[in-house]
Amino acid sequence: MLFGRLTERAQRVLAHAQEEAIRLNHSNIGTEHLLLGLMKEPEGIAAKVLESFNITEDKVIEEVEKLIGHGQDHVGTLHYTPRAKKVIELSMDEARKLHHNFVGTEHILLGLIRENEGVAARVFANLDLNITKARAQVVKALGNPEMSNKNAQASKSNNTPTLDSLARDLTVIAKDGTLDPVIGRDKEITRVIEVLSRRTKNNPVLIGEPGVGKTAIAEGLAQAIVNNEVPETLKDKRVMSLDMGTVVAGTKYRGEFEERLKKVMEEIQQAGNVILFIDELHTLVGAGGAEGAIDASNILKPALARGELQCIGATTLDEYRKNIEKDAALERRFQPVQVDEPSVVDTVAILKGLRDRYEAHHRINISDEAIEAAVKLSNRYVSDRFLPDKAIDLIDEASSKVRLKSHTTPNNLKEIEQEIEKVKNEKDAAVHAQEFENAANLRDKQTKLEKQYEEAKNEWKNTQNGMSTSLSEEDIAEVIAGWTGIPLTKINETESEKLLSLEDTLHERVIGQKDAVNSISKAVRRARAGLKDPKRPIGSFIFLGPTGVGKTELARALAESMFGDDDAMIRVDMSEFMEKHAVSRLVGAPPGYVGHDDGGQLTEKVRRKPYSVILFDEIEKAHPDVFNILLQVLDDGHLTDTKGRTVDFRNTIIIMTSNVGAQELQDQRFAGFGGSSDGQDYETIRKTMLKELKNSFRPEFLNRVDDIIVFHKLTKEELKEIVTMMVNKLTNRLSEQNINIIVTDKAKDKIAEEGYDPEYGARPLIRAIQKTIEDNLSELILDGNQIEGKKVTVDHDGKEFKYDIAEQTSETKTPSQA
């Protein structure tokens, strides 16, 4: 807060406010203490105005003590509450509107009147202060009618009327104290001052990525000029921010734009104390240059070269390269000042400097922990934007969320409101029906409810005023989780249980394959507990095994357990990448080729969903060179698409499936399933498949994968479990048509026997169920048999499948086992 702009009496008011907070044993200085401070200065305009409304110091003290009472013994430094900070800001705004250079007690009172949510506002309400009349009385006591900023500014700068209508005076705004403080940019501001002090070509251009604080440096220069922290050459200069869109707007006829811009240049040259700031400098190129007319950049070039016009530009690296560097004559007139992204430490300092402004706006307390969490989490998880902009946005949105959450009307008040509305409608209906006795009863009920509502509302407001809302790390994590979809909030008990039992959840869909399920589950738990390497994906796996043992199904089951839907994973079928050039489909077509603007199938999906399961199915079908592009994904967790954007893979689980080596196993008569030859050696199968994998893929690719898992052979018992699972799916589908189907154990055993194939794994079971159950049921339905609403029992008598159709009963009877 700018205490240097306070009058002596206003400074004493703040000192009295601090004393009152100490007297009442309160830990913060709030609006009520500011009001008590005003009453302690009886000679001030504020106290005199309040006395004219019969509000005395004793009454205010009594009301404050009644509303919030005395606190416990307080030890430590007193801080202003966000509402008190807001009042000081509003008082400065009032002083500016009244064209006063200093803030007095009267402005603080006007600020208290405008802040309608603090304890002071409730004191005014309880003492029946008419806010409108009080404000008018203050203005009358000052003997100074309010004028608009616009009129004041015009009266101060009559020598540049065109410029004033098209540009904002940053020095005036800085003098008013409404610009945010600029922290940690001393080096860049010094370099700008050095360039501005040159004799010719004294035009700095601030170049940097979006959101690193280029515009803030121009504002920092304006603040330095106001605070006399600049050399003699720049003292009393005005920094005017010119928007090229405003200059072009309304120029209907040819020559109007050039005339307007020339007039601005003449005014700047005559004034001699104007530094022009053009944000988005690249808009100069081509502005107003329709139908062969001269554009803005060519009009400004001569004045820029001679030093007659001082201009600060700001633009991004890409726009500077595309627009400014392309025009060498324009480029040489500007001196580039590189604005780099601040470090994490610098960003924390910047946010701490801005904290007062955001606390005053949102009326909450922002802790140091929340600031540090905002910087670290945004730096780690929001990779396509830059500090400090993304961290500031995170603090702003999280503060807004907390503020809205804490000030939402509670349910009990809403219920009473609805009840009042209902009773009111009933009363009106009774009056229309001329049931006056009933209407009188309803009126009494309405009055009682309204009184109850007021009491509940006052109680809620008291609770709100006594409670200091704070922004915590958890609030920051919630917002960034909403931005990115990555779960960052603290693990609650339910989620903890879910993660610890992830193996059981996956085994509900994937029968057997304990090693694969355990590896995947451990990787997910490591990531959620915050122990994974922050520079690599959550996990990368290669699943090996013959066809039909559950490799792809495990990836689907993982996607369902994490996102609630097995279609939520990003699936890339590698059989579509048999040609070498097909790799462009992953990262996007090169410049000049069709589809360059569409982006890559993989990179675009991961940019939209950075927290996902990525399945590369049947990797041995793809061209070997395709996998070179995955090397940096597996090692560093990022991939650059054809537009130069870095896509973050650090929050993905990468699963690759392969049947490599299955043919050789078949030749060796190792089918990969339990059957007649139960003595097959899993280690022999594993070694054979890994050997084939090493022959098919490069060592630098395999070395980057976290785990290579060879899936186990499926036993007969596991095949029976799979049959049961498939039958349950069929039962669910038929239940939608109101058909109840029961499949006996004998029928299931026969299906498992018919569907078992050592070469094709578990997939033939699907065909066996289609052949034995679905085909016959479909014929029964189409033959005109009314089986809807009935119970169908499927059994096997040792020779063929039997279908028994019966009426459904309340008791489910077990079918006879023949």
Curated annotation (Swiss-Prot):
GO molecular function: ATP binding; ATP hydrolysis activity
Entry superkingdom: Bacteria
One Gene Ontology cellular component: cytoplasm
Chain residue ranges for the region called Repeat 1: 6-71
Matches recorded under InterPro entries: AAA+_ATPase, ATPase_AAA_core, Clp_ATPase_C, Clp_N_dom_sf, Clp_R_dom, ClpA/B, ClpA/B_CS1, ClpA/B_CS2
Any single Pfam family the record assigns to this protein: ClpB_D2-small
Keyword field: ATP-binding, Chaperone, Nucleotide-binding, Repeat, Stress response
Renumbered residue ranges of the record's region I: 163-410
Record region (Repeat 2): 80-144
This protein's record includes keyword Chaperone: yes
SMART domains recorded: AAA (SM00382), ClpB_D2-small (SM01086)
Function description: Required for growth at high temperatures, probably by acting as a chaperone during heat shock and targeting heat-denatured proteins for degradation by ClpP.
Family label: Belongs to the ClpA/ClpB family. ClpC subfamily.
Name of this protein: ATP-dependent Clp protease ATP-binding subunit ClpC
Gene source species: Staphylococcus aureus (strain bovine RF122 / ET3-1)
